[in-house]
């Protein structure tokens, strides 16, 4: 696990999951008042660099931003969000292709295709096509390992669920929300943003601790190795926070994004609810830790011990293999970028970058 600590707010908006690539780019489009700048170009053609320059310029002006990292290469950006301006600039190419719904009104296309010398690139047509195919094959293989690991982790979650006192969990969640979430006036407008705080990457699992510390001063950490208890707790807290009028940031589980929340932020209260487990341990001082074993029949749970240990060992090995394949895919992508970089007019890219900075800032 790589723990990224910075003063900035960092998220992912997409990741490889057991169901394949799962992205939250479209939900961002539908956040109230959001205007999108959609970058179009090839690999290695300056999309991430353009966004890094915009992020740097915004930070120098003291603007609050969210940096959206690429799960296939966390050192690269997939986007920059300006929460207060209700603007975002995104890499709108595969695997998270986006097209404008209302060009010029809701979205502005920032095309860099004109900076590519197609004549130079066509000289290496076969090499480029082969690298695209190899990259796709490696990513597909990695996804299958992640799917296998996800199946085992889901089995562990179901085993824990067999031993859980869910009525006790519900009572606890109700008391917790009553204590921490005062009901807002009826004029309050609840809302939800979807982000990923962690993902499986070529560097292994990455978890943005710095984001937690940037968005919150109070931390409620649910220590749950298998996820059945924390899953229900976060579902109940999410529903109650929205019912009480809060704007929240919901962070789905990168392994089971369709039906499990791992973390939840309430920025107006500087409050975070976090899940701590072997895949993304939470190492932050001053947390209020809740051991989810308190909600389990431990004697019943002991009967699953061998099964749970096997699942964890096997899932770890499968994810290690997925990470290795993702690293190979990144190397393949890096090689692909060399062909494109040799065919790009970066002076023209810089010109577009300056125009975009002036338009957004």
Residue locations for each model-derived region?
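Glycine-rich phosphate-binding P-loop
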Residues: 36-55, 204-241
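N-terminal pre-Walker A segment at the start of P-loop NTPase domains
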Residues: 1-28, 167-171, 175-212
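Conserved nucleotide-sensing/catalytic segment adjacent to the nucleotide-binding pocket
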Residues: 2-21, 56-120, 126-127, 241-320
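N-terminal accessory targeting/assembly segments
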Residues: 2-61, 220
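A cross-family "folded-core" feature that marks the main globular domain of proteins
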Residues: 39-40, 50, 58, 66-69, ...
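An accessory alpha-helical subdomain
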Residues: 127-179, 310, 314-356
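Residue-level preference for short coil/turn positions at secondary-structure junctions
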Residues: 32-33, 85, 215-216, 269
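N-terminal low-complexity, Ser/Thr/acidic repeat segments characteristic of secreted
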Residues: 35, 185-190, 218, 351-358
């Amino acid at each position: 696990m790589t723990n990224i600590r910075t003063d900035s707010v960092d998220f992912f908006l997409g990741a490889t999951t057991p169901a394949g690539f799962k992205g939250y780019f479209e939900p961002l489009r539908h956040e109230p008042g959001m205007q999108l700048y959609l970058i179009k170009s090839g690999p290695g053609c300056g999309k991430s660099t353009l966004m890094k320059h915009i992020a740097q310029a915004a930070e120098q002006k003291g603007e609050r931003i969210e940096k959206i990292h690429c799960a296939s290469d966390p050192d690269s950006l997939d986007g920059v969000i300006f929460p207060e301006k209700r603007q975002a600039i995104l890499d709108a190419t595969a695997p998270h292709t986006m097209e404008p719904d209302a060009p010029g009104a809701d979205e502005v296309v920032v095309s860099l295709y004109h900076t590519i010398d197609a004549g130079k690139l066509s000289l290496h047509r076969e090499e480029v096509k082969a690298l695209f195919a190899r990259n796709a094959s490696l990513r597909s293989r990695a996804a299958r390992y992640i799917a296998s690991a996800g199946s085992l982790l889901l089995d562990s979650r179901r085993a824990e669920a067999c031993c859980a006192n869910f009525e006790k969990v519900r009572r606890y969640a109700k008391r917790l929300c009553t204590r921490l979430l005062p009901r807002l006036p009826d004029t309050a407008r609840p809302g939800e943003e979807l982000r990923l705080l962690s993902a499986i990457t070529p560097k292994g699992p990455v978890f943005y601790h710095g984001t937690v510390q940037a968005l919150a001063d109070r931390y409620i950490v649910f220590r749950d190795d298998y996820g059945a208890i924390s899953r229900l707790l976060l579902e109940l807290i999410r529903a109650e926070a929205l019912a009480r009028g809060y704007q929240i940031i919901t962070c789905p589980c990168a392994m089971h994004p369709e039906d499990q929340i791992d973390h939840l932020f309430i920025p107006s209260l500087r409050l975070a609810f976090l899940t701590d487990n072997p895949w993304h341990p939470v190492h932050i001082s001053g947390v209020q830790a809740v051991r989810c074993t308190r909600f389990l029949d431990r004697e019943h749970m002991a009967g699953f011990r061998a099964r749970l240990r096997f699942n964890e060992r096997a899932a770890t090995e499968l994810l290690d293999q997925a990470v290795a394949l993702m690293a190979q895919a990144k190397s393949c992508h890096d090689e692909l970028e060399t062909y494109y970089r040799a065919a790009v007019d970066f002076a023209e890219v810089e010109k577009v970058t300056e125009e975009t900075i002036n338009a957004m800032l």
